[in-house]
């Protein structure tokens, strides 16, 4: 896991806030929200592969949404009761970066919607 000082140098203030302070970018503001290219979405902090473009869908929420992740063992899931809501937070298992949340209202085949901050991801085009 990278130390906080190194991450502050590497990341933009928004990327740091989202990944290290469990922040949330404004809806429809992220550069990956409407990305339609084929490729892999990686953790911006440690470069691990998290999501594939084949599982991305338009949810209308304003954040990149995926119905599945590449490897459930690569993501940590924990209950988040902040903001007077009960949600499931998702973070990168390798480095602990906050990614977003997962909700049980996605499309088939999983019925899940991983609602992920663009600021926590980088995209590698195929």
Where are these regions (language model features)?
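A short Gly-Trp-Pro
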Residues: 1-126
């Amino acid at each position: 896991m990278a130390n906080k000082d190194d991450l502050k140098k590497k990341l933009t203030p928004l990327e740091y806030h989202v990944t290290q302070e469990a922040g949330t970018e404004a809806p429809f503001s992220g550069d990956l929200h409407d990305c339609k290219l084929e490729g892999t979405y990686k953790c911006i902090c440690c470069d691990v592969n998290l999501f594939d473009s084949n599982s991305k869908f338009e949810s209308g929420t304003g954040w990149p949404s995926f119905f599945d992740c590449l490897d459930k063992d690569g993501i940590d899931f924990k209950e988040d009761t902040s903001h007077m809501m009960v949600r499931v937070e998702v973070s990168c298992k390798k480095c602990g970066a906050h990614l977003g949340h997962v909700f049980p209202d996605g499309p088939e085949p999983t019925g899940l919607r991983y609602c992920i901050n663009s600021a926590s991801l980088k995209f590698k085009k195929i």
